[in-house]
Swiss-Prot record:
It catalyses: UDP-N-acetyl-alpha-D-muramoyl-L-alanine + D-glutamate + ATP = UDP-N-acetyl-alpha-D-muramoyl-L-alanyl-D-glutamate + ADP + phosphate + H(+). Cell wall formation. Catalyzes the addition of glutamate to the nucleotide precursor UDP-N-acetylmuramoyl-L-alanine (UMA). It holds the Pfam family Mur_ligase_M. One of its GO terms (molecular function) is ATP binding. Its EC number is 6.3.2.9. Belongs to the MurCDEF family. This is UDP-N-acetylmuramoylalanine--D-glutamate ligase. ATP binds at residues 119-125. It comes from Streptococcus agalactiae serotype III (strain NEM316). The gene is murD. One of its GO terms (biological process) is cell wall organization. It is found in: Cytoplasm. Pathway: Cell wall biogenesis; peptidoglycan biosynthesis. InterPro entries: Mur-like_cat_sf, Mur_ligase_C, Mur_ligase_C_dom_sf, Mur_ligase_cen, MurD.
Length: 451
């Protein structure tokens, strides 16, 4: 970690805790800042705030009082989940207090090379694939960012021999100014998080911030399956490295069921360790980054062949009596479920779907669910999902929760079948988050395996 004096003896407000806010507060204190943390959760229910207070950091909890900004703060570090139209953020901007993101703070003190990965779907899997390939090739890839390891925590233990492999959300990228990866990946761009950004155009603009400071000596890996990526590619100073499953490009591509990089045969599509067309795209992006990093074809091939997926993202759990179980709880939109289904023979799949009702109809899903062996439907959106199943001619059962859904699916399944949790919906109608939903699926699988 570099020693910088930017924040020394400066008053800094950290707005919002969670893991990234906690890490930012501790890093700022280490850099000599006079830190105040403001979090909406009451102090007596906030062990993180209590811990920070014991370390000498001022905490204001239970609300976000605008008068707090009457103090002469020099900077605000904003939790990525807090939108820019939040009254505290708006007042800070009106007072011309610089509002930084936690990843920008981490970047300012980092002395490690940075690989940044963003996109609508596939971020976590691609980030994990890249880190595993780098490490298998003898380099030191450290996971950071939106993948569960706050960047401002990871950088404190990293040096110039490490490579930060950082997953970045649109929330984290919105507002970055100096942030500059040496290699950036945008897996794909789909309409999502529009409630936060307001429009698809603003969402894309936030993602595109990843390349703002890049130059021709940096590399931008883009999905040329998408026309929008081809158009955006014309507007960057970075060197473009495309990937595509539909055409031969000057980068990573598929030809005759094999993965290539600039004419070099890397591996067979069927040898990728996780199923689904989306994982072919993730593997291509990983290959592009790995080749730029100097990793050998053999290491790339072996790592991607042995890759078992990421928890809750088309995670293979194993088999019970010849029935395969896949946990894709991270599938919170239709596109993710479409991509998950693309890796299987529909006639052998029992799909568990449904969740938070956002008013979406699921007609887009009809071609993808046609031919399924059965569906088990749950959650607020159940009636809408069932309408799609009816139109697709697929039989279905109702379930009370994920545990009940697994048992209903298991009753229908036979040897050689697949039970797939890929809800196409957020989890918040029934579960705290998609991780809790997925954990219930895993627990039920383990119970069945133990019977």
């Amino acid at each position: 970690m570099k020693t910088i004096t930017t924040f020394e003896n400066k008053k800094v407000l950290v707005l919002g805790l969670a893991r990234s806010g906690e890490a930012a507060a501790r890093l700022l204190a280490k850099l000599g800042a006079i830190v105040t943390v403001n979090d909406g959760k009451p102090f007596d229910e906030n062990p993180t705030a209590q811990s920070l207070l014991e370390e000498g950091i001022k905490v204001v909890c239970g609300s976000h009082p605008l008068e707090l900004l009457d103090e002469d703060f020099c900077y605000m570090i904003k939790n990525p989940g807090i939108p820019y139209n939040n009254p505290m953020v708006k007042k800070a901007l009106e007072k011309q207090i610089p509002v930084l993101t936690e990843v920008e703070l981490a970047y300012l003190v980092s002395e490690s090379q940075l690989i940044g990965i963003t996109g609508s779907n596939g971020k976590t899997t691609t980030t994990t694939m890249i880190a595993e390939v780098l490490n298998a090739g003898g380099q030191r890839g450290l996971l950071a960012g939106n993948i569960g390891f706050p960047a401002s925590e990871v950088v404190q233990a990293a040096d110039d021999k490490d490579i930060l492999v950082m997953e970045l959300s649109s929330f984290q990228l919105m507002g970055v100014k100096e942030f500059r990866p040496h290699i950036a990946v945008i897996t794909n761009l789909m309409p999502t998080h529009l409630d936060y950004h307001g429009s698809f155009e603003d969402y894309v603009a936030a993602k595109w911030n990843i390349q703002n400071q890049m130059s021709s000596s940096d590399f931008l890996v883009l999905n040329f399956n998408q026309g929008i990526s081809k158009e955006l590619a014309k507007t960057t100073k970075a060197t473009i490295v495309p990937f595509s499953t539909t055409e031969k490009v000057d980068g990573a591509y598929v030809q005759d069921k094999q993965l290539f990089y600039k004419g070099e045969n890397i591996m067979l599509v069927d040898d990728i360790g996780v199923p689904g067309s989306h994982n072919v795209e993730n593997a291509l992006a990983t290959i592009a980054v790995a080749k730029l990093a100097g990793i050998s074809n053999q290491v790339i091939r072996e790592t991607l062949s042995n890759f078992g997926g990421v928890k809750h993202r088309l995670q293979s759990l194993g088999k019970v009596h010849g029935i395969s179980f896949y946990n894709d709880s991270k599938s919170t939109n239709i596109l993710a479920t479409q991509k998950a289904l693309s890796g299987f023979d529909n006639t052998k799949v029992i799909l568990i779907a449904g969740g938070l009702d956002r008013g979406n109809e699921f007609d887009e899903l009809i071609p993808d669910i046609t031919g399924l062996k059965h569906m088990v439907v749950l959650g607020e959106s159940a009636s809408r999902v069932k309408r799609a199943a009816q139109k697709a001619g697929v039989t279905y059962s109702d379930a009370l929760d994920v545990r009940d859904a697994v048992h209903k699916a298991y009753e229908v399944a036979q040897q050689g079948d697949v039970i797939l949790l890929s809800p196409a919906n957020a989890s918040w109608d029934m579960y705290k988050n998609f991780e809790v939903r997925g954990d219930e699926f895993i627990d039920t699988f383990e119970s069945l395996r133990g019977e």
